[in-house]
Amino acid sequence: MFIGIVTLFPEMFKAITEFGVTGRAVKQNLLQVRCYNPRDFTHDKHKTVDDRPYGGGPGMLMMVQPLRDAIHSAKAEAGEGVKVIYLSPQGRKLEQSGVTELAQNKKLILVCGRYEGIDERLIQTEVDEEWSIGDYVLTGGELPAMTLIDAVARFIPGVLGKQASADEDSFAAGLLDCPHYTRPEELDGLTVPPVLMSGNHEQIRKWRLTQSLERTWLRRPELLEKLALTDEQKKILNQIKSETV
């Protein structure tokens, strides 16, 4: 997968390219990450990348020419079929279903805004989609871009040891994840649920499903409204509700 990043702070993305699962994906050539700094496309000795907004007001906007040239350079390297995304508070909120959609693309370009944002005409002519990671304001698009990359990279074949890890994570099936346990068997008087050590795979599956449904109902009940539950899930959920009322 190719991901181009238009950013004034390419050094920040070492967190993606050099560490953890995404860093390993880069080393294995499963994920290619390229940064394009608008400063490298300026024409003045000061490498100016901001400009005043028409109409006045506080703050500055990213200068059109360097930003547009950086986007064009990213598009040229990516080639045909690339999707350009602008990280923006006005964008579609990133949820697991959206991550799954974005993971279907083999080429993405992420535009990271700074200052008060970018010229609306660039959004109209250069950007395919706007995405947001939440209803709050950050100082730039770099952290949202890193969040998106980390989430999407998990679906690249070979990035995770087992694809089931991505498929079974919280939200992947619309439910919160079940509790997990490892050694020791007892920790500060707390023990591992016996069913997990029983070796009975069907009982373990049912226990995990029950835990996921219970956690989702108690912590994020609105998620259940979006799901088409199976008959088994409905039965388990009704039992959970009857036992907790």
Swiss-Prot record:
Which InterPro entries does UniProt cross-reference here? Alpha/beta_knot_MTases, tRNA_m1G_MeTrfase_C_sf, tRNA_m1G_MeTrfase_TrmD, tRNA_m1G_MTases_N, tRNA_MeTrfase_TRMD/TRM10
Annotated compartments: Cytoplasm
Record-level GO BP terms: tRNA N1-guanine methylation
Describe the reaction catalysed, as an equation: guanosine(37) in tRNA + S-adenosyl-L-methionine = N(1)-methylguanosine(37) in tRNA + S-adenosyl-L-homocysteine + H(+)
Per the UniProt entry, the Enzyme Commission number(s) are: 2.1.1.228
**Alphabetic keyword roster:** Cytoplasm, Methyltransferase, S-adenosyl-L-methionine, Transferase, tRNA processing
Which Pfam families does the record cross-reference, listed alphabetically? Answer: tRNA_m1G_MT
Query: GO terms for CC?
Result: cytosol
Domain of life, per UniProt, equals: Bacteria
Residues bound to S-adenosyl-L-methionine: 113, 133-138
Drop me one GO molecular function for this one.
Answer: tRNA (guanine(37)-N1)-methyltransferase activity
Q: How does it assemble?
A: Homodimer.
The text of the family note is: Belongs to the RNA methyltransferase TrmD family.
Q: What does this protein do?
A: Specifically methylates guanosine-37 in various tRNAs.
Protein name as it appears in the record: tRNA (guanine-N(1)-)-methyltransferase
Q: Which gene encodes it?
A: trmD
